[in-house]
Design a protein with these regions (language model features):
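Short, compositionally biased
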Residues: 2-156, 223-237
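C-terminal, surface-exposed recognition/capping segments
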Residues: 3-6, 17, 39, 158-159, ...
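Hydrophobic core segments of beta-strands in well-ordered, beta-rich domains
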Residues: 99, 162-163
Length: 237
């Protein structure tokens, strides 16, 4: 059996590949892997490397500042050395941490208590073209512009913010794996519902994204329409 791939295999993938070659079939390879690893084996935790060589994927972010690359094979019987506080996503140079729960216990809420300013200085924050909105990757900056009028039910911890439309799309295309990690971490899955983004369309409205079908819309009045909010933070690697 020979597998050709142009992508370098990780250590775990190389081990599984060699095990499959040795056993000759997937069923026996899975049994051998279970025997070797054992049900009580703890997934390896590694301090986030500073070299930028961190593998792309979904990570379990721990309270002690470490992160574990999440494997879909993990079960509730896999133990962790410390509490999981967020889910990390790395895609090339892009990284983001996703909170374990929606704000306001998952209720649909308004984004703000009133409209934002419409002064010349505010205009730099408003994006009315789809292509530009999708390219918006600065949710932290956007949230700072909203912070003084933000709904009080949105209780953002330090350095946490509401994702921009561009950041949300990167989360959306990885939703299946992120939700598996959220379930493992005893968090709440991202729902097939509308979520607020921090990308403002105008003084009165902001862009929203449906996690059910990826559709986005911009005529949503920030102070009256109600949608879900999920906070994020920078994932430094």
């Amino acid at each position: 059996m020979e597998i050709q791939t142009s992508k370098a295999l990780s250590d775990v993938q190389q081990f599984r590949y060699e095990l499959l070659q040795w056993c000759g079939n997937v069923e026996d390879a899975e049994k051998a892997n279970t025997f070797v690893m054992g049900n009580d084996e703890k997934p390896v935790q590694a301090q986030l490397p500073k070299s930028g060589n961190m593998e792309d994927g979904i990570y379990l972010v721990h309270a002690d500042g470490k992160a574990t690359l999440f494997e879909l094979e993990y079960t509730k019987d896999d133990n962790m050395d410390s509490e999981i506080v967020a889910i990390g996503l790395k895609m090339g140079g892009f990284g983001i941490k996703i909170a374990l729960h929606d704000e306001a216990n998952g209720d649909g809420i308004t984004l703000t208590t009133k409209s934002n300013g419409d002064l010349k200085a505010d205009q730099d924050y408003y994006i009315d073209k789809y292509d530009d909105a999708v390219a918006d990757m600065d949710g932290a900056r956007n949230t700072n512009h909203l912070r003084s009028i933000l709904n009080k039910q949105i209780k953002l911890a330090d350095d946490w913010y509401i994702p921009s439309l561009g950041e949300w799309y990167r989360i959306f295309i990885n939703k299946k794996a992120i939700n598996a990690a959220l379930e493992f971490a005893k968090g709440d899955k991202l729902q097939d519902r509308w979520y607020w983004t921090s990308t403002e369309y105008s003084a009165t409205s902001a862009w929203i994204l449906s996690l059910g079908d990826g559709y986005t819309y911009h005529w949503s009045t920030k102070a009256s329409y109600t949608y879900r909010v999920r906070a994020v933070s920078a994932f430094i690697f």
